[in-house]
Amino acid sequence: IELSQKESKSTFVLGTDGKNWDKIVTPFGGIRLQPDEQDLKLEIKDGNNNLWTCHQPMMKGEDVFNFSVNVAPNIINEVIKISGIDKSDIEFFAIHQANKQIVETIAEKAEIPAEKTSSETFTKYANNSTNSVVTVICDQLKNKKVKNILLCTFGIGLSWAACTIDFSDVYNGGIDTYISNQKNINKKEQIDHWIKYFKGEE
């Protein structure tokens, strides 16, 4: 990273929809709903015989899909309009890799040329949550010189954001795989570690 006096313009659009907070949520945990011993034994089956326990997240898939493919194209077009950049001058659109179908539907609805975006990163790395847009950039733009790129993300909250950024002075070396030489520890060893850690013994 080098300090520069050069101005690099960025434009952001952000939004939230708190009334639909329960579409992607872990109901128990934190301060809102602290589970006790009885809650931890709770097991519920839905109409398809899927098992849910209180410490697991839940998602209303159809609602989240519809939210994603409707809000994302709108904010993509909105941030382009505010930025003053011509859409044809945006060289790459990095879209949150929720899944392949969502990414491709957003691209189609936002009329993004296929060569200017990708769902390939999802195929390689899956949905890695808050890292996914950065992963797309590192994966798809490795060692490439581009100026105008657009980032778009959406998800829990429900929330969404998009921005245009000047990428012309950014070095992108891609993704390196780091393999740790640390030995894998089993569940009991992990629990023992955290007990000792909490007690200040480690």
Question: How would you label these PLM feature ranges?
Answer:
Residues 1-66, 70, 74, 166-202:
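Condensing-enzyme catalytic core mediating Claisen C-C bond formation in acyl metabolism
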Residues 64, 79-83:
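Short helix-to-loop capping/linker segments positioned immediately adjacent to catalytic or ligand/cofactor-binding
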Residues 69-80, 91-202:
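Claisen-condensing/thiolase-fold acyl-transfer catalytic domains that form or cleave C-C bonds
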Residues 84-89:
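Short, surface-exposed connector motifs at secondary-structure boundaries
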